[in-house]
From Swiss-Prot:
Pathway given in the UniProt record: Amino-acid biosynthesis; S-adenosyl-L-methionine biosynthesis; S-adenosyl-L-methionine from L-methionine: step 1/1
Binding-site positions, K(+): 45
Annotated signal sequence range: none
UniProt gene name: metK
Cofactor(s) in the UniProt record: Mg(2+); K(+)
Similarity field: Belongs to the AdoMet synthase family.
Compartment annotation: Cytoplasm
Keyword set, alphabetical order: ATP-binding, Cytoplasm, Magnesium, Metal-binding, Nucleotide-binding, One-carbon metabolism, Potassium, Transferase
Binding site for ATP: 17, 179-181, 250-251, 259, 265-266, 282, 286
Job description of the protein: Catalyzes the formation of S-adenosylmethionine (AdoMet) from methionine and ATP. The overall synthetic reaction is composed of two sequential steps, AdoMet formation and the subsequent tripolyphosphate hydrolysis which occurs prior to release of AdoMet from the enzyme.
Protein name as annotated: S-adenosylmethionine synthase
Taxonomic lineage: Bacteria, Bacillati, Actinomycetota, Actinomycetes, Mycobacteriales
The organism of origin for this protein: Mycobacterium leprae (strain TN)
Length: 403
């Protein structure tokens, strides 16, 4: 295609994908610990394979009951996803659960508990007391492609993945199984989405289901058409979509029996579908003292409010931290030529309106709550099915006043 015209593709996966099972387990453990002790420090990684779950990491907590009950938390989440029988390749009630969790490193804890600003610089502000849990760079992004200010390819891929799960769980298509993937390719002209080009839907199913006679027509009618009918987009042509359903022919063997899964292997699915840059840090299983998670949420909050305020049509913001320091060491703003005001003014307004110290992010977004398991599948940003604090548009007026 020409420079003005291009195709862009994003993918999503269902909650029964092996990697997403792991994200869900890690975040369910996190939520259970935070519910009992909001100050829990948690870094939990999960691996699943045929008949087995391995949970490892570092936890410092006063949540004795939740910690002792981790094995049951694991099993309950697997069963809720839909793996409840050996006939489906995995059973949360009978799988092996191995737990190997130690305490958070005291070397890391000292920098988080007492930041460089307090230890070395003598700062007195309470929000200077909490240092970043690690070094790193985090990105936030927003674009006016959709009402939720997300890139359209990933937004549509998530809607299809959620719909796959809905029709499985509510009995519309009872022969579907938990594992599945969606992929959306959209044609753009001058950065405007103009045509839905290709949709790929791969879904695990019961044995004996005919692809051509049953599965493909059902997926088109009950999943794709339903999502497209609900899609409100002025410029997108959906009249000639190429649809590929289970292009391997069948998908009976899935879940942890088909592939091993790990926490944190779907970071592009979790964020912006490849449309924006990524700092590399995964989210699931991490408490908000880890800026990989909390600062990425904060930067989405920043970006979304900037676009909603009309300061740019799309924006990417980067923040960077040093371990043990409260104040960010870097902030970068990219508006891709869509700004309504000087980007330098936008950057200055960010500094005036948003406090990006970890303690302030946790305070302003109320992050010491058990809200994370609901983010483990279908994206952390632009969610239309759950309310998340970093999606609120509560800084629009403040930004306008600051410009």
């Amino acid at each position: 295609m020409s420079e003005k015209g291009r195709l862009f593709t994003s993918e999503s996966v269902t909650e029964g994908h092996p990697d997403k099972i792991c994200d869900a387990i890690s975040d369910s453990i996190l939520d259970a610990l935070l519910a009992e002790d909001p100050c829990s420090r948690v870094a939990v990684e999960t691996l699943v394979t045929t008949g087995q779950v391995h949970v490892v990491g570092e936890v410092t907590t006063l949540a004795k009951t939740a910690f002792a009950d981790i094995s049951n938390t694991v099993r309950e989440r697997i069963l809720d996803i839909g793996y409840d029988s050996s006939d489906k390749g995995f059973d949360g009630a009978s799988c092996g659960v191995n737990i190997g969790i130690g305490a958070q490193s005291s070397d890391i804890a000292q920098g988080v508990n007492t930041a460089h600003e307090v230890r070395v610089e003598g700062a007195a502000d309470p929000l200077d007391a909490q240092g970043a849990g690690d070094q790193g760079l985090m990105f936030g992004y927003a674009i006016n492609d959709t009402p939720e200010l997300m890139p359209l390819p990933i937004a549509l891929a998530h809607r299809l993945a959620r719909r796959l799960t809905e029709v499985r769980k509510n009995g519309v298509l009872p022969y579907l199984r938990s594992d599945g993937k969606t992929q959306v390719t959209i044609a753009y002209e001058d950065n405007v989405p103009v045509r839905l080009d290709t949709v790929v839907i791969s879904t695990q199913h019961a044995a004996g289901v005919d692809l051509d006679a049953t599965l493909a027509p059902d997926i088109r009618e009950k999943v794709l058409n339903t999502v497209i009918d609900d899609l409100s987009h002025d410029t997108l042509d959906v009249s000639s979509v190429r649809v590929l359903v289970n292009p391997t022919g069948k998908f009976v063997l899935g879940g942890p029996m088909g592939d091993a899964g790990l926490t944190g292997r779907k970071i592009i699915v979790d964020t912006y579908g490849g449309w924006a840059r990524h700092g590399g840090g995964a989210f699931s299983g991490k408490d908000p003292s880890k800026v990989d998670r909390s600062a990425a949420y904060a930067m989405r909050w920043v970006a979304k409010n900037i676009v909603a305020a009309g300061l740019a049509e799309r924006i990417e913001v980067q923040v960077a931290y040093a371990i043990g320091k409260a104040a960010p060491v870097g902030l970068f703003v990219e508006t891709f030529g869509t700004e309504a005001v000087d980007p330098a003014k936008i950057e200055k307004a960010i500094g005036e309106v948003f406090d990006l110290r970890p303690g302030a992010i946790i305070r302003d977004l109320h992050l010491l709550r058990p809200i994370y398991a609901q983010t483990a599948a279908y994206g952390h940003f632009g969610r239309t099915d759950v309310e998340l604090p970093w999606e609120q548009l509560n800084k629009v007026d403040d930004l306008k006043r600051a410009i």
